[in-house]
């Protein structure tokens, strides 16, 4: 109890003194501000997507949280993931459908604030009209497996 109160007191003091916006007190406590996320290309997705891994890594059997940023007019062909993924739309509109081939007429438009829970090995596809940011979390190892191997950008 004392260590919890001491950590809370330290947190409040640092917050009042203008401590950096992103920091971790321990392995179980972390805060991340959007402007301090580090974005990188995503080799398993078509060019243009960016990822910021907040918790992970995605390749291990541990909890993961990541943000993905997609440009306007972006498409991801039909693919599936080996684990359940919880998707929250942070901004923009995330158009998602299930099936073996991308068909924009068979999607549901999820606006900011929406949630999708993708079951393992369920083929699905996505596209955007405008820049869209989603947050994905689950327990790894995660990955992207394309229904049509020719769609996999890692093989091009």
Regions of interest found by a model, annotated:
Residues 71-74, 80-101:
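Glycine- and acidic-residue-biased ligand/ion/polar-headgroup-sensing regions
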Residues 28-31, 105, 125-156:
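Double-stranded beta-helix
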Residues 1-5:
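Positively charged n-region of N-terminal signal peptides that target proteins for export
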Residues 76-78, 96-97, 118, 123-129:
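Short beta-strand His + acidic residue motifs that chelate non-heme Fe in jelly-roll/DSBH
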Residues 22-64, 149-156:
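A short, N-terminal "cap"/entry segment at the start of jelly-roll beta-barrel domains
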Residues 59, 94, 100-121:
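Short acidic-glycine-tyrosine-enriched beta hairpin
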Residues 8-19:
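Bacterial N-terminal signal peptides
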Residues 61-81, 110, 119-120:
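Conserved short histidine dyad/triad with adjacent acidic residue
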């Amino acid at each position: 109890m004392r260590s919890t109160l001491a950590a809370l007191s330290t947190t409040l003091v640092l917050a009042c003194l203008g401590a950096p916006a992103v920091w971790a007190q321990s392995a179980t406590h972390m805060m991340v501000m959007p402007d301090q996320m580090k974005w990188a290309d995503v080799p398993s997705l078509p060019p243009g997507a960016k990822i910021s891994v907040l918790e992970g890594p995605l390749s291990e059997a541990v909890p993961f949280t990541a943000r993905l940023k997609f440009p306007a007019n972006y498409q991801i062909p039909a693919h599936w993931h080996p684990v359940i993924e919880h998707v929250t739309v942070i901004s923009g509109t995330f158009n998602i459908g299930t099936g073996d081939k991308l068909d924009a007429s068979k999607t549901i438009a999820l606006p900011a604030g929406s949630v999708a829970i993708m079951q393992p090995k369920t083929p699905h596809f996505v596209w955007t009209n405008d820049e869209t940011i989603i947050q994905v979390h689950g327990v790894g190892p995660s990955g992207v497996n394309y229904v049509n191997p020719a769609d996999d950008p890692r093989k091009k």
